[in-house]
From Swiss-Prot:
This is Mitochondrial import inner membrane translocase subunit TIM8. It comes from Candida albicans (strain SC5314 / ATCC MYA-2876) (Yeast). The keyword Membrane applies. Belongs to the small Tim family. GO terms for cellular component: mitochondrial inner membrane; mitochondrial intermembrane space protein transporter complex.
Amino acid sequence: MSSLSTTAIQSLDEASRKEIMQFVESEQSKSKVQSSIHNFTDMCFKKCNKDKPITSATLDGQEEACLKNCLNRFLDTNIKVVEALQGR
């Protein structure tokens, strides 16, 4: 993938520059969300499957419940933090 030079971007009209910036910001936001999901899933998987050998391609009921609970707690916490920051 080639990168755009500063000169190439500056030669665009204002509307095109704005559209490119919005696209880049959108892609960065998507990347952050995907990274967070990956980190939460990894952390919760390690928490819920600590010291257990992987014996199947599927989760048992206890593992599934633990993962759901772990992820929901993180989501709830993040929502509360965002709400608190927005309230300031």
